[in-house]
């Protein structure tokens, strides 16, 4: 049985702790305030803002290899606010469906055996784009047959129905419907690519009264192949994309090459080629600044800020027309499942001095 003296000693110790802990917490708070104040100055070793700003982002709701965040409209609304705060004015649905998973209740695709989605994401994105003064680009359907066969022509048949259907359901209804993303990703002279891009681009423009279209291929650099010796050379890249642009420039308005497959000291060389080719064919030259890190052994964390900065600086030097990213919600958003994404958002704001 506890004696009265032991009980009083315990009570005294508890009282002392009650006094000390708040003081410790208060002092920690002061240290944090001091640290935050110092960090807010963001004394960088490089000139601030000497790069292209990201003004567009893909929306990756039907993903190949990135975890789903399971957001509802409340989370998406908040994310559009975060985008707007750093100057994003364009959102691009990367694909409206992949194999059997789709983003809207498409009568045609449901008839082809696709699964019914629980919500109409296309309608939601268009409403949020209108709310925040953004333009929405619709990404076409990906049946997966191109990835299985490496023949792009398979994608034309399904999208012949999807394009007409989507314009009827949404394009005539929402002012925020601003264009089309032809979602097939290629890197080189892929079989059927020129014909497929031309057919789909032509139909998109005809049905919508000439709204803009774009593609986002990758550069077949050393990070895209298992053996760096097999990476595309600058001359090969220019020759093959000269041929592709020649065949599609009348129905594809812009090309946003993905920037993550080449090394950082190759950016200026390849970017200058891309801009020269785009200018030759009267196309807009965008960059798809990947905000995930291809240099890591896992797929895929948010990118280190300096790597993103180097790529955006190179895009500015090349005179590119627009910078978009793949993709804000996973890799730059303060509410991303990746903790590092919110820190990337903060570093980006510091660099461009965005309040």
What is each stretch, according to the model?
Residues 8-27:
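N-terminal export signals
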Residues 74-99, 248-250, 254:
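Catalytic domains of carbohydrate-active enzymes, especially glycoside hydrolases
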Residues 79-80, 92-142, 196-211:
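Aromatic-lined substrate-binding rim segments of carbohydrate-active enzymes
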Residues 118-128, 151-177, 244:
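An active-site-proximal structural segment forming one wall of the substrate-binding cleft
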Residues 137-148, 201-236, 257, 284-292:
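Aromatic-lined carbohydrate-recognition surfaces of secreted/lumenal glycan-active proteins
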Residues 141-146, 165-192:
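Active-site groove signature of glycoside hydrolases
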Residues 177-184, 237-266:
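Aromatic- and acid-rich polysaccharide-binding/catalytic face
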Residues 259-263, 284-354:
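Substrate-binding cleft of secreted/luminal carbohydrate-active enzymes
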């Amino acid at each position: 049985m506890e004696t009265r003296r032991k009980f009083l000693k315990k009570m005294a110790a508890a009282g002392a702790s009650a006094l000390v802990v708040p003081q410790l917490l208060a002092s920690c708070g002061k240290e944090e305030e001091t640290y935050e104040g110092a960090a807010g100055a963001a004394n960088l070793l490089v000139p601030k803002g000497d790069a292209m700003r990201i003004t567009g982002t893909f929306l990756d709701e039907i993903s190949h290899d990135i975890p789903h965040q399971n957001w509802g409209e409340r989370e998406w609304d908040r994310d559009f606010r975060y985008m707007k705060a750093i100057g994003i004015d364009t959102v691009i649905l990367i694909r409206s469906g992949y194999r059997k998973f789709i983003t809207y209740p498409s009568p045609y695709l449901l008839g082809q055996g696709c699964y019914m989605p629980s919500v109409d994401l296309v309608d939601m994105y268009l409403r949020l784009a209108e709310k925040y003064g953004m333009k929405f680009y619709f990404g076409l359907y990906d049946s997966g047959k191109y990835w299985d066969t490496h023949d792009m022509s398979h994608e034309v048949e399904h999208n012949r129905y999807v394009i007409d259907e989507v314009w009827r359901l949404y394009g005539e209804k929402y002012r925020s419907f601003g264009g089309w993303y032809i979602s097939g990703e290629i890197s080189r002279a892929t079989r059927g690519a020129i014909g497929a891009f031309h057919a789909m681009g032509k139909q998109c423009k005809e049905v919508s009264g000439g709204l803009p279209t774009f593609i986002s291929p990758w550069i077949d650099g050393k990070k895209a192949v298992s053996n760096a010796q097999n990476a595309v050379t600058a001359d090969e890249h220019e020759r093959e994309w000269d041929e592709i642009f020649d065949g599609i420039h009348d129905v594809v308005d812009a090309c946003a090459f993905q920037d993550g497959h080449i090394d950082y000291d190759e950016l200026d060389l390849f970017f200058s080629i891309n801009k020269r080719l785009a200018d030759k064919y009267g196309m807009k030259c965008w960059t798809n600044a990947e905000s995930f890190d291809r240099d890591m052994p896992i797929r895929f964390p948010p990118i280190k800020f300096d790597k993103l900065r180097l790529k955006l600086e190179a895009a500015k030097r090349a005179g590119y027309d627009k910078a978009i990213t793949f993709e804000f919600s996973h890799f730059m958003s303060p509410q991303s499942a990746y903790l590092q994404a919110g820190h990337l958002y903060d570093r980006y704001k510091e660099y461009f001095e965005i309040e």
